[in-house]
């Protein structure tokens, strides 16, 4: 394990361990103190959430999310109407009573990669506030480094997201914002996707999901396009 609170190395050495992980059996999960951030909340993220909850007098289900916009989207999807959304520096704490909505809300947070990062939590716990000028300089440097690896893409056109699934969810939402007013609400899934990508389409309430299992079946896609209601084609 790297000597860092942000490091993640997890071994599930036996099939029984894998089954215990998937079934969330306590005997397995008591040994898992770190993991892929969307599936296992980093200890620093949990500490930041607890500290903010104490500050605002909140309890129940606690979700430290990257932005108010992300919080509003997920609250609407999960039909949570009794939540508090408290600003905490450059992120927000969403809290609401434990209940039937807790698990679906948590799942959609997972699908969208909207939790704050462990480094963001660490900065908050250390009392380091976000500096907009420093953030802008850091983003400029990241874009400059990435630009040579992305053909014909200007640095200003590179959008940096919180995480991989966060980028996917944001991209789908952006396309929907453009296509929905045009009456285009059908998404074609071409081939099998990573599970969270699939769930974004399956759980959407304002779009239709069409699954073409064979990634080479371009003919199936071409037969759907003339209908004029396709918002996009998604494949991985």
Predicted regions and their residues:
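Catalytic core of soluble alpha/beta enzymes
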Residues: 215
């Amino acid at each position: 394990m790297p000597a860092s609170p942000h490091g993640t190395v997890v071994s599930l050495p036996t099939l029984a361990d894998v089954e215990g992980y998937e079934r969330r059996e306590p005997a397995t999960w008591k040994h898992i103190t770190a993991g892929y951030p969307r599936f296992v909340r980093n200890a620093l993220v949990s500490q930041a959430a607890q500290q903010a909850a104490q500050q605002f007098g909140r309890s129940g289900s606690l979700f430290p999310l990257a932005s108010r916009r992300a919080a509003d989207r997920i609250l609407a999807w999960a039909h949570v109407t009794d939540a508090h959304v408290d600003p905490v520096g450059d992120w927000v704490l969403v809290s609401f009573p434990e209940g039937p909505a807790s698990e679906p809300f948590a799942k959609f947070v997972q699908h969208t990669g909207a939790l704050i990062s462990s480094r963001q939590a660490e900065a908050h716990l250390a009392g380091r506030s976000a500096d907009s000028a420093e953030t802008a300089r850091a983003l400029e440097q990241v874009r400059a480094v990435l630009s040579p690896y992305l053909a014909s893409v200007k640095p200003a056109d590179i959008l940096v997201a919180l995480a991989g699934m966060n980028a996917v969810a944001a991209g789908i939402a952006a396309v929907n914002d453009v296509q929905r007013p045009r009456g285009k609400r059908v998404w074609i899934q071409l081939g099998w996707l990573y599970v969270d990508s699939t769930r974004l389409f399956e759980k959407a309430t304002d779009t239709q999901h069409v699954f073409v299992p064979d990634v080479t079946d371009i003919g199936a896609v071409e037969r759907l396009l003339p209908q004029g209601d396709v918002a996009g084609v998604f494949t991985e």
